[in-house]
Amino acid sequence: VDGSRLKLAENIAVTKQVADFAHANDIACEAELGSVMGHEGAGANMDYEEIFRTKKGFTDLGEAKQFAEETKCDWLSVAVGSIHGAIAEGVRNQKKPEARLDIEHIADLSKVTGIPLVLHGGSGINNQCILDGIANGIAKINVGTEIRQTYERTLGETNDVEKARAAVYTRTCEIIRSFRIEGNQEKLCG
């Protein structure tokens, strides 16, 4: 449930309704709180260093605690320094600026929420930063930009869907190894 653009009370109400419905049907619920930079081109002209320093848009600890307690969501996507992929058509094929994660903030969010944290905008982040994030509470990492660009680049170069699929498979295996989650399917997927 992405209610991140809603006011806190409205996000809580919407997410709680979805989580209650999902749980009644034995389905887990992921929710989002905070403003991940770069979504649909937003923040493209903002200075990343200033945002990181001030934590503008980062998931607030008090709000995260309240959100997790009241919504009973199973996973919480948090804003901790990552940048959403190049979603807007005009920047679709551009390399993302290199982002980093506020590891201390991740650890604090993990403590106050007590639930697995999700990282949107995981493509292009330094691998050690990702590993540190995992060690401090990140349990799911979205890397859609990396996967999509691999597919589109290979398809554009070869005009062969099967080669593009094979390139995605290879890149996905590389990412799994780099995140050190190889062999964790049961743990990750239940």
PLM segments and residue spans:
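Thr-Gly-centered strand-to-loop micro-motif
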Residues: 119-121
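Active-site-adjacent substrate-binding region
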Residues: 116
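C-terminal alpha-helical cap/extension of soluble enzyme domains
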Residues: 125-190
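Alpha/beta enzyme core
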Residues: 1-113, 127-150, 182
